[in-house]
Structures are given as C-alpha cells and as structure tokens.
Amino acid sequence: MNSFYTEEELTQIGFKSIGKDVKISRKASIYSPQDISIGDNVRIDDFCILSGKITIGSHIHISAYVALYGAMGIVMEDYSGISPKSVVYSAMDDFSGDYLVGPIHPEQSINVKGGVVIIKRFVQIGSNVVVFPKLTIGEGAAIGACSLVNHDVEEWSINYGVPSKKYKERRKNLLKFIKEKGLKDMSNYEVSINHRGGGILRQYMVCALIERRAAA
C-alpha cells in the first residue's frame, strides 16, 4: 500500500479545498477537514496533526511530527516550510490558576485566548520550534531549531533563541529560483476567529550553523 493517500482518497476526506500534487501520509491525523484548505505541490509527512482552521498555500513541506492547532486560524503562504517536531498554536489556555485548563471542561470554566498565526512566503521554521498565537512571521524569515516565537518576526531575518531574537539578515538569493508570476497573493485570505477550548503551538528547523556561528 502507498504510504500517501491517493488523489481519490484525499477527495473523500472532505477538505474545504485541495490542489494538485498533494501528498499526505496515511499516518497523519486530520481533524475538521472541512476547515482546511491546501494548495498545489504540498507534502505532509508521518504523524503530523492538523486541526482547526488552516490554510496551506502551494509548494510547502510539513515534516514529520509537526502539529498545527488552528482553533483561531493558521495561514502558511507559498514556499514556507516546517521542520520535524515543531508546533504552531493559534490559541492557548490560561495557566494562571484562575481557570481550568483543557478542552474537556465547560466553556465557562476555561479562558482561552489567541489569534491567527500567519507564516508568510519563504519562511523556514527549524525543528522543535514553538510558535505562539496571534503573530506574523514575516516573508523570508528563518527560525533556528529549538526556538520560542512569541512576537512578530521581521521579514528576511534569521532568528533563534528563547524567546527568539534576530541574529542577522537573511539572503534573498533563493528568489532566483522562483518565477514571481507563479506566486499567489494570499494577503486577502480571511480566517474566521472562533474558538472553543484547547491550547496550541508550532515550529520548524533551520540549519544548526546558526547556533554554531553565534557561539564562534
């Protein structure tokens, strides 16, 4: 048996929309597919979790063990990517002790807050990165492995750390491989903000050279 769903099987899952050349592992877990849109040339590997309101553009690779919790919305624009074991949260519970924690409790006993997470074009997120809700990772930014992203990230920058901080500018040479006319404008994508319960987080992997150079 093929490790990825066939085109016919993907159609039967019931996605809001799905493009061409999409490969999704049979070992991935898809919840609320009616709220998930996927573009062209996308690959989603083993043991990924996709839940909630998620918009995935085209030419995107989501590596193994990545979790996208889109209760309040997650948008991944074209040519972005996430490395293994990263998590993106669009909503989080209140850990102050004033409320119960988790989606199993009545709505009046929890305090969930968050907002849409937008991952712009050409963003690369390293392994074991945690992305908090209600932020934008700017076009072309790179996030080093094991980082915590809790604020907006400047475009075309290399970032790492807990919390993540800008290390230096990122080169744009990769653009020579892209025909600008082939890029989609996703700035008008609308993500409805509704949520009931649950907590969330996200991440991807960039070369460990970032850490090594910083230590040099």
Where in the sequence are the language-model features?
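Conserved beta-strand-loop-alpha-helix hinge in the C-terminal portion
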Residues: 156-179
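Flexible glycine-rich beta->alpha loop in the catalytic core of nucleotide-sugar glycosyltransferases
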Residues: 86, 93, 136, 147-148, ...
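Flexible, glycine/small-residue-enriched loop-and-beta-strand segment within the central core
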Residues: 2-7, 26-38, 43-133, 162, ...
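Intrinsic low-complexity, glycine/proline- and repeat-rich
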Residues: 182-216
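Beta-rich strand-turn-strand
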Residues: 118, 128-141, 147-150
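Short, well-structured beta-strand-loop connectors
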Residues: 125, 143-145, 159-160
